[in-house]
Amino acid sequence: MLGHMWRAAKASKFVTWAPCPSKGWTSGAISLFSGTRAPPVPSFFHQTIRKRPMTEAPMFTPFSLRGMTLKNRLVMSPMCQYSAEDGTVNDWHVVHLGSRAMGGTALVIAEMTDVSPEGRISHKCAGMYKPEHMPAWKRVVDFVHTHSDAKIGIQLGHAGRKASCHVQWEGAGPLPADQAWETIAPSALPFSPDSQTPREMTRADMERLIEAYAQAARWSEQAGFDMIEIHGGHGYLISSFISPLTNKRTDEYGGSLENRMRFPLEVFHAIRANWPEDKPISMRISAFDWAEGGTEVDDAVEIGKMMKAAGLDILDVSSGNVTNDPRPRVEGLFQTPFSERVRAEAGIPTMTVGNVGGPEQINGIIAEERADLCCMAKGQMFDPYFAHHAAQKLGVEDYKWPNQYGAAGFFKPVD
């Protein structure tokens, strides 16, 4: 436990952590939507923020999952870098992940790493589908472990019907026919009018991919990763099985939520069987599809219960990106209520993600038990040393910078 006392002068800021001071928020409640196309606001959004006395900075308290102990509650979200060559990561990934680890983040999660070549979003996506990928990832992992006390996870996934596209800064649209590859999905439904129609998966496809996930887990262990996250959100392959908008199967893999969860659970069990018992597994889900007829938060609670019963250690609670319809414009912390409800009702630890801002927000999320960990993506793109800067801002005592950067702890920025 860090020997830091939360300053009394911060108390009022702490109590009112949830609403960002931007328009769209009201005192003690959350107003999420602008425009008219969004579905109705789930009833649990309208609730008073609980108040609780604080004496310490919750952001800088440790947290354990199985044999992995994190020094604080900050996680770097997996973010596709589109910088690999034939699936092999390189110096960019060493710097990208290594700098955030050196910057004080407790857990850095590598981008969605595809378990088969047809599962790539683009030609430049990272992979763990052939033996030569493992040593390249090991170089990244070794750097993080050698030069920081951070832990490093890998997000394993398959893009499904959202595969075979240009990289983000080239428009992210479907590749032309002479560069494209076949895509697969639970049902033959294209992601957008311009997208390739995926082939509906057979049982043989499922068995092949279950083994691909298992092999990727074995290589991830050889590379030294501390955690695996399964990408089960955002409209990629596993997410497409879960959502009723994208799974129209009439066999045992479609229909009821129990059936739609069959393939995700088969993947999880295969990974768990090939991953050390003392190392945790996470899964990212889209808890709310932002579309009529899609996944609702009640479903997310049930998913949390199923995954907890199967042995999942923590649920990374995101939302949306399942369909081509744009997500409604939202304010900060718009997904935290999903995490809070799943955590409370499913009884499983959660990570929250989505427009998480300053350290006061993170302190509030942890103290109010809305999530156990806070994922930050764009914020850590902007500031790789967010954790160090937060510790300085909060006045955390005995905070340790990397030895090479120790003098920075004495720097006092001028506003």
Walk through the language-model features, giving the residues of each.
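Active-site donor-binding loop signature of nucleotide-sugar glycosyltransferases
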Residues: P19-S22, S34-T36
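Intrinsically disordered or compositionally simple regulatory linkers and C-terminal tails
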Residues: S34-P53
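A charged, well-structured terminal subsegment
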Residues: G28-A29, G35, L394-E397
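A short beta-strand->alpha-helix segment at the C-terminal rim
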Residues: M1-P21, S27
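A residue-level signal for beta-strand positions that form part of recognition/binding surfaces
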Residues: A11, G28-S31, P62, R73
